[in-house]
Amino acid sequence: MIESEASVKGRVVAEMLSHFTNDLKIGKKIKSGELRKRMIEPPWIPPAMFNLTGINMDHFTMKLLSLKENPNMDYVILQLHGGGYTGAVRNAYYVFAGLYNELSHGCNVLTPDYRVAPENPYPAALEDALASYRWLLSKGYYGEQIILAGDSAGGGLAMALCM
Protein backbone atom coordinates (compact mmCIF):
# COMPACT_ATOMS: atom_id res chain seq x y z
CA MET A 1 0.00 0.00 0.00
CA ILE A 2 2.80 2.47 0.79
CA GLU A 3 4.46 1.71 -2.54
CA SER A 4 1.26 2.41 -4.48
CA GLU A 5 0.74 5.66 -2.54
CA ALA A 6 4.25 6.75 -3.42
CA SER A 7 3.61 5.88 -7.05
CA VAL A 8 0.42 7.93 -7.07
CA LYS A 9 2.21 10.86 -5.41
CA GLY A 10 5.08 10.48 -7.86
CA ARG A 11 2.73 10.51 -10.84
CA VAL A 12 0.92 13.60 -9.51
CA VAL A 13 4.20 15.48 -9.01
CA ALA A 14 5.54 14.38 -12.40
CA GLU A 15 2.33 15.44 -14.11
CA MET A 16 2.34 18.84 -12.41
CA LEU A 17 5.98 19.42 -13.31
CA SER A 18 5.38 18.42 -16.92
CA HIS A 19 2.61 21.01 -17.20
CA PHE A 20 4.93 23.68 -15.85
CA THR A 21 8.02 22.76 -17.88
CA ASN A 22 6.12 22.05 -21.10
CA ASP A 23 4.26 25.37 -20.98
CA LEU A 24 4.91 27.11 -24.28
CA LYS A 25 5.93 30.42 -22.68
CA ILE A 26 7.89 29.35 -19.60
CA GLY A 27 8.86 25.74 -20.31
CA LYS A 28 11.11 26.53 -23.26
CA LYS A 29 12.87 29.22 -21.25
CA ILE A 30 13.48 26.82 -18.35
CA LYS A 31 14.78 24.03 -20.58
CA SER A 32 17.04 26.33 -22.63
CA GLY A 33 18.47 28.08 -19.59
CA GLU A 34 17.20 31.49 -20.76
CA LEU A 35 15.27 32.07 -17.54
CA ARG A 36 18.39 31.35 -15.49
CA LYS A 37 20.54 33.74 -17.54
CA ARG A 38 18.22 36.68 -16.92
CA MET A 39 18.52 36.44 -13.15
CA ILE A 40 20.87 39.33 -12.42
CA GLU A 41 21.77 40.31 -8.88
CA PRO A 42 23.85 43.25 -7.71
CA PRO A 43 27.27 42.38 -6.28
CA TRP A 44 26.96 41.13 -2.71
CA ILE A 45 28.47 43.44 -0.11
CA PRO A 46 29.63 41.59 3.01
CA PRO A 47 28.96 42.90 6.51
CA ALA A 48 31.76 45.13 7.83
CA MET A 49 33.36 42.36 9.91
CA PHE A 50 34.19 40.27 6.79
CA ASN A 51 36.58 40.28 3.88
CA LEU A 52 35.26 38.77 0.64
CA THR A 53 38.16 37.86 -1.62
CA GLY A 54 37.67 36.91 -5.26
CA ILE A 55 39.84 34.09 -6.61
CA ASN A 56 40.22 33.35 -10.31
CA MET A 57 40.72 29.75 -11.33
CA ASP A 58 41.28 28.41 -14.87
CA HIS A 59 37.59 27.89 -15.70
CA PHE A 60 35.64 29.46 -12.82
CA THR A 61 35.85 31.88 -9.91
CA MET A 62 35.60 31.48 -6.15
CA LYS A 63 35.02 33.80 -3.22
CA LEU A 64 36.59 33.40 0.20
CA LEU A 65 34.70 34.89 3.12
CA SER A 66 36.86 35.50 6.18
CA LEU A 67 36.72 37.53 9.35
CA LYS A 68 38.82 40.69 9.24
CA GLU A 69 40.02 40.02 12.79
CA ASN A 70 40.99 36.68 14.34
CA PRO A 71 39.74 34.20 11.73
CA ASN A 72 39.65 30.58 12.86
CA MET A 73 42.27 28.88 10.67
CA ASP A 74 41.82 25.44 12.24
CA TYR A 75 39.18 24.50 9.66
CA VAL A 76 37.75 25.82 6.41
CA ILE A 77 34.31 25.27 4.92
CA LEU A 78 33.99 24.49 1.21
CA GLN A 79 30.44 25.53 0.36
CA LEU A 80 29.04 24.08 -2.88
CA HIS A 81 25.91 25.88 -4.02
CA GLY A 82 22.68 24.37 -5.25
CA GLY A 83 20.90 25.19 -8.48
CA GLY A 84 20.33 21.91 -10.28
CA TYR A 85 23.78 22.10 -11.92
CA THR A 86 22.34 24.86 -14.14
CA GLY A 87 22.36 27.93 -11.88
CA ALA A 88 25.24 30.17 -10.89
CA VAL A 89 25.95 30.96 -7.27
CA ARG A 90 23.37 33.38 -5.85
CA ASN A 91 23.80 36.07 -3.19
CA ALA A 92 21.91 33.89 -0.73
CA TYR A 93 24.94 31.57 -0.62
CA TYR A 94 27.18 34.40 0.58
CA VAL A 95 24.63 35.03 3.33
CA PHE A 96 24.88 31.30 4.13
CA ALA A 97 28.68 31.67 4.16
CA GLY A 98 28.34 34.30 6.87
CA LEU A 99 26.11 31.96 8.87
CA TYR A 100 28.58 29.09 8.43
CA ASN A 101 31.32 31.42 9.64
CA GLU A 102 29.31 32.36 12.71
CA LEU A 103 28.30 28.79 13.55
CA SER A 104 31.87 27.52 13.14
CA HIS A 105 33.35 30.20 15.42
CA GLY A 106 35.04 32.11 12.61
CA CYS A 107 36.11 29.54 10.01
CA ASN A 108 36.77 30.81 6.50
CA VAL A 109 34.19 29.80 3.88
CA LEU A 110 35.17 29.18 0.25
CA THR A 111 32.32 29.33 -2.28
CA PRO A 112 33.18 28.34 -5.85
CA ASP A 113 30.97 29.54 -8.70
CA TYR A 114 31.47 26.29 -10.59
CA ARG A 115 30.68 25.82 -14.28
CA VAL A 116 27.09 24.80 -15.01
CA ALA A 117 25.05 23.10 -17.73
CA PRO A 118 23.93 23.27 -20.43
CA GLU A 119 27.05 25.18 -21.56
CA ASN A 120 29.30 23.01 -19.39
CA PRO A 121 27.88 19.50 -18.96
CA TYR A 122 29.10 16.82 -16.56
CA PRO A 123 31.82 16.49 -15.30
CA ALA A 124 32.60 20.25 -15.37
CA ALA A 125 30.97 21.06 -12.00
CA LEU A 126 32.68 18.12 -10.31
CA GLU A 127 36.05 19.06 -11.83
CA ASP A 128 35.64 22.59 -10.46
CA ALA A 129 34.62 21.30 -7.02
CA LEU A 130 37.73 19.10 -7.01
CA ALA A 131 39.90 22.04 -8.13
CA SER A 132 38.47 24.08 -5.23
CA TYR A 133 39.33 21.31 -2.78
CA ARG A 134 42.85 21.02 -4.21
CA TRP A 135 43.26 24.80 -3.97
CA LEU A 136 42.53 24.57 -0.24
CA LEU A 137 45.11 21.79 0.07
CA SER A 138 47.64 24.02 -1.74
CA LYS A 139 46.99 26.73 0.87
CA GLY A 140 48.10 24.41 3.67
CA TYR A 141 44.86 22.82 4.80
CA TYR A 142 44.77 19.07 5.35
CA GLY A 143 41.80 17.01 4.18
CA GLU A 144 40.55 16.56 7.74
CA GLN A 145 40.43 20.37 8.15
CA ILE A 146 38.12 20.88 5.16
CA ILE A 147 34.40 20.77 5.92
CA LEU A 148 32.16 20.19 2.90
CA ALA A 149 28.77 21.88 2.82
CA GLY A 150 26.23 21.85 0.03
CA ASP A 151 22.55 21.77 -0.77
CA SER A 152 20.77 20.21 -3.73
CA ALA A 153 23.30 20.00 -6.57
CA GLY A 154 25.97 21.22 -4.15
CA GLY A 155 25.12 18.36 -1.80
CA GLY A 156 25.59 15.95 -4.68
CA LEU A 157 28.97 17.49 -5.47
CA ALA A 158 29.98 17.25 -1.80
CA MET A 159 29.06 13.55 -1.78
CA ALA A 160 30.95 12.98 -5.04
CA LEU A 161 34.04 14.66 -3.59
CA CYS A 162 33.89 12.32 -0.61
CA MET A 163 34.03 9.33 -2.91
What residues fall within each predicted segment?
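A glycine/proline-hinged amphipathic helix-loop "lid/cap" segment
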Residues: 1-69
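A generic structural signal for alpha->beta connector loops
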Residues: 49, 59, 106, 143-145
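Conserved beta-strand scaffold positions in the cores of enzyme catalytic domains, especially
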Residues: 52-54, 77, 109-111
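Short strand-loop-helix active-site module centered on a catalytic nucleophile
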Residues: 62, 78, 112-113, 120-163
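Short beta-strand element of the alpha/beta-hydrolase
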Residues: 73-83
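Serine-hydrolase catalytic-loop signature spanning alpha/beta hydrolases and amidase-signature enzymes
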Residues: 84-87, 91-92, 109, 135
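Short strand->helix junction
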Residues: 85-86, 115-119
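Short amphipathic alpha-helix adjacent to the substrate-entry channel of hydrolases
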Residues: 91-111
